[in-house]
Amino acid sequence: MNTVRVTFLLVFVLAVSLGQADKDENRMEMQEKTEQGESYLDFAENLLLQKLEELEAKLLEEDSEESRNSRQKRCIGEGVPCDENDPRCCSGLVCLKPTLHGIWYKSYYCYKK
C-alpha cells in the first residue's frame, strides 16, 4: 500500500511540475500567437481602409461629374392631366388636349409624341 501511495505521489509531483512548465510554455505560445494575430489584424485593417478610400474616391468622382441640374425632375406619366402652361410630362411625352374620349374634361393630358 505504501508503494502505491509513493508511486501516486511521485506521478502527482511530476504531473504538477511538468504541467506548470507546459502552462508557462502555453502562455508564451499564446502571447506569440496574439502578437501575430494583432499584426495580421492590423494588416487586414489597413487593406480594408485602402479599399474603402478607393471606393469613396470613385463615388465622390462620380458625384462631382454628375450635375444636379441634369437630373430629371418629377414628371407626369402618360394619360395624366397636365397644365398647358407648365407641362411636367416625362421625357418622350407631350402635354396635349385630349382627342375624342377626353374632350369633355376640358383639360390637357400627357401623351406619347
Swiss-Prot record:
Key words, A-Z: Disulfide bond, Ion channel impairing toxin, Knottin, Secreted, Signal, Toxin
GO cellular component: extracellular region
Keyword Transmembrane helix listed: no
Iron in keyword set: no
Molecular function terms, GO-annotated: sodium channel inhibitor activity; toxin activity
Protein's job: Probable ion channel inhibitor.
Name assigned to this protein: U11-theraphotoxin-Hhn1a
Species in which this protein is naturally found: Cyriopagopus hainanus
